[in-house]
From Swiss-Prot:
Domain of life: Bacteria
Protein name: Large ribosomal subunit protein uL10
Keyword Secreted: no
Gene3D superfamilies: 3.30.70.1730, 6.10.250.290
């Protein structure tokens, strides 16, 4: 089915806008994956802030020109599904990695973060990135740890004095 030129321009503009606002991109080949499984993937993508798009490669190549994801052009061979992470850089990688475990025919082709092309085998590195909430929690615990240690140190001095006084008292009672 032929697509009109105006429609092609609209598709390119939409994908370009998505790519310009995305934090990371994962490209996969979904040949052989059932429609039901793809519907499940789309539902999970919506829940995790990932934008899925299936676009012809020629249109996709034009759409990602001038964006951080221009480096994935060479991976655009055959049918491709694009997963753009809009809020969390590792969201699309986690989603595609988990889906690939369930669907043996789902193959990850390439991924990109910050203009760098990563091989499909490096998806674990991107998938293991903490979410924003996890990163903030880790930062808070690192910042609170020295203060907590200082408070414990201050509390330790009176505790030691109390133990010494109790030991002297017990010693005097035993001597009496």
């Amino acid at each position: 089915m032929a697509i009109r030129l105006e429609d092609k321009k609209a598709i390119v503009a939409e994908v370009n806008e998505t790519a310009a606002n995305a934090l990371s991109l994962v490209v996969a080949d979904a040949r052989g994956v059932t429609v039901g499984a793809m519907d499940t993937l789309r539902k999970q993508a919506r829940e995790s802030g990932v934008r899925l798009q299936v676009v012809r490669n020629t249109l996709a190549k034009r759409a990602i020109e001038g964006t951080d994801f221009e480096c994935v052009k060479d991976a655009l061979v055959g049918p491709s599904i694009f997963g753009f992470s809009m809020e969390d850089p590792g969201a699309a990688a986690r989603l595609f990695k988990d889906f690939a475990k369930e669907q043996s025919k789902f193959e990850i082709k390439a991924l990109s973060v910050g203009g760098k092309l990563l091989e499909a085998g490096q998806i674990d590195a991107l998938a293991k990135l903490p979410t924003l909430e996890q990163a903030l929690g880790q930062l808070a615990s690192v910042m609170i740890a020295p203060v907590t240690k200082l408070v414990r140190t201050f509390n330790e001095v009176p505790t030691k004095v109390t133990r010494v006084v109790a030991a002297v008292r017990d010693q005097k009672q035993d001597a009496a």
